[in-house]
Amino acid sequence: MCLVFIVNRQPFGGMKLSAFGGGVKAGGPNYCACLVKITDKPESNTDYKQSYPHAYEEEFAHARDINKLYGEQNAFRYLPLKNMVLRLFPGDSNEEAEMIALATKLCHTPLTISFDPNDDRTTALSSTGCTLKKETLDEFLKTMRSYERIRTCGADIPMEMYEEAARRNKYIATAKPVKNGRVELIHYIKEQSISFEFHRYGSILDVPPVE
């Protein structure tokens, strides 16, 4: 028997090693974003430096109880990742790296930017405030295990990265960075839902704060 639950009231999916993927819970507000490919329009004039902070404050910064049921609290919130690494390749632009750096900073997720010694980005990306590492692909593969999530600017990456990620149970976010913060910031957090009943035998207890 196969049971599939997609419940807005209590979005679910494990934490720690019981969860694999982008940290988005089934039935939650970002569930459908996992099922589609979202890219910027070529003529988009969205300013990511404005969109990202606005999206963080409006959507990602605060816990909330969407359904507000009497006697039951279903808190939904976003948590930062322990750490993340962005692996850059020669075809990736510095602007894409800067977009990702800003997004992780807003989400309080520590970011390391890794690139090949022959593709030195140290000067160009020094203003991001991120940890910068010059390392070959082989050297990078040996360090993948130490990051909670891996980010790239596209899916066209060496197969060795996918193989190492599979061995280490790591998720690689390969979507091309977009300027819309409501979409882009999903890559740099994980969701948590907590259900709590504050009634006993019909009597309502103290209503806990949503935090």
Region annotations inferred by a language model:
Residues 1-211:
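C-terminal segments
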